[in-house]
Amino acid sequence: MLEQLLHIDGQILLWIQEYLRFPALTSVMKDITNLENAGILWILITIVLLLDKKTRNVGYMSALALIGSLIVDNILLKNLVARTRPYEVVDGLKLLIEKQSDYSFPSGHTGSSFASAIVLWKELPKKYGVMALIVAVLIAYSRLYVGVHYPSDVLAGVVIGTVLALVSVWLVKKIQGQKKLVK
């Protein structure tokens, strides 16, 4: 069963390569995937949120979700699962960016993108939240497009990031509610 799922994962990547890669889109996808290197996009957004008193709690939520994503995705699961990158094992898959130095599962880019974007979607005016979700989806897709993740890596990143975002929102609201009761 697991072998079949792994095979399907690879076949989806080859299908994307065959039917959805276009020269004009490739440079855009490379730029989108690089947007999230080291989490920089979401970290910058979080810093901006923390600087404004009106959005500070949203900044706390995003920061907590991003830290959770770093720990769960990049420190724990990548090393625990130790899944080889698809470009190393899927015959015919062409890598469009430089080789990655860590393991494949789950997608850290996707996890951190959804961790922050879901917070923004839940807590900011919808136009900002929707923009954040669109960027997160584009980053997730770019990881497939450039050949560094399997679809299941990206799906796991979406799920983990979303759960961490929801827990972070709940936790910060709970802490803020307790602070108000103490005063």
Language-model region placement:
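Interfacial segments of alpha-helical transmembrane regions
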Residues: 45-71
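Helix-loop junctions at the membrane-solvent interface of multi-pass transporters
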Residues: 51, 79-80, 175
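Small-polar-interrupted transmembrane alpha-helices in polytopic inner-membrane proteins
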Residues: 64-78, 129-142
